[in-house]
């Protein structure tokens, strides 16, 4: 969507971009000179979409001068996150308890949902951490609780970790330091030798011994800012 592609649409409450691969919003794609709406417009788009820094501009010009409108006055709703929420194969999970999770048929559904969740972008995951699947739980929170019940997820302090259903991908996120306790957690200890891919989704610190016995490790996908204690090599040789 190019410059001034969507201009002065002050009465439009919902915008749907249905390209399954995402959309590119250029600078000034949305322009509201003197006519920013009194509500927050909903913008539905795939999380792979690319938004220019000034994709919505002229928000505080003319009659709107001094109103302090920003792009936060739009609701960005990611369609791939919504597709996960509406997936019929996963609908029973949102009313399931920990005891139900251990039933073989249910555990299989949880594993499939975990794999689907892991494949989502960070933006889509963030939406699932906010959207409610019932009156108290978010979709991400409920799924993680069920995954813990069958040994596919856990916590060490402020670090959360999950392992894929095939046991080959270990994902860690959170804040603070990943300690040697990681290698000593029972379910990790039993599976760590099969981990081929390590995904580090947040800028944590990895302490010596945290990745002990990860002898099959082939790839590490880490965000910028991950640190290691003392600058030492914490990865297995």
What is each stretch, according to the model?
Residues 34-89, 148-156:
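Extracellular/surface-exposed low-complexity segments
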Residues 102, 109, 151-191:
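N-terminal segments that cap or nucleate solenoid repeat domains
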Residues 1, 9-24, 38-51, 167-175, ...:
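Structural signature of tandem-repeat unit edges
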Residues 80-151:
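Beta-rich interaction/scaffold domains
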Residues 5-9, 29-30, 210, 234-235:
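Periodic small-residue-enriched repeat registers in elongated scaffold domains
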Residues 32, 54, 111-116, 156, ...:
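A composition-driven surface/loop motif
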Residues 12, 119-129, 179, 217-219:
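Short loop/beta submotifs within extracellular cysteine-rich repeat domains
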Residues 22-26, 48-58, 124-127:
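Short, charged/polar "capping" segments at the starts of alpha-helices
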């Amino acid at each position: 969507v190019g410059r001034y592609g969507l201009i002065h649409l002050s009465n439009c409450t919902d915008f749907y971009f249905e390209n399954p691969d995402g959309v590119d919003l250029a600078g000034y794609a949305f322009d509201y000179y003197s006519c920013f709406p009194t509500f927050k417009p909903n913008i539905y788009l795939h999380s792979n979409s690319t938004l220019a820094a000034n994709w919505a501009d002229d928000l505080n010009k003319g009659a709107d001068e001094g109103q302090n409108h920003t792009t936060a006055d739009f609701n960005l709703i990611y369609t791939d996150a919504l597709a996960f929420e509406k997936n019929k194969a996963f609908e029973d999970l949102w009313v399931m308890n920990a005891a139900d999770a251990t039933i073989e048929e249910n555990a299989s559904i949880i594993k499939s949902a975990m794999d689907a969740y892991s494949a989502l972008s960070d933006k889509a995951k963030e939406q699932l951490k906010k959207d409610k699947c019932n009156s108290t739980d978010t979709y991400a929170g409920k799924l993680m609780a069920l995954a813990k019940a069958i040994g596919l997820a856990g916590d060490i302090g402020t670090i959360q970790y999950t392992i894929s259903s095939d046991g080959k991908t270990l994902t860690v996120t959170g804040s603070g330091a990943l300690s040697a306790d990681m290698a000593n957690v029972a379910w990790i200890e039993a599976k760590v030798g099969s981990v081929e891919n390590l995904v580090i989704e947040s800028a944590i610190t990895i302490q010596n011994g945290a990745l002990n016995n990860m002898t099959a490790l082939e790839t590490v996908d880490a965000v910028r800012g991950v640190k290691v204690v003392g600058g030492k090599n914490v990865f297995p040789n």
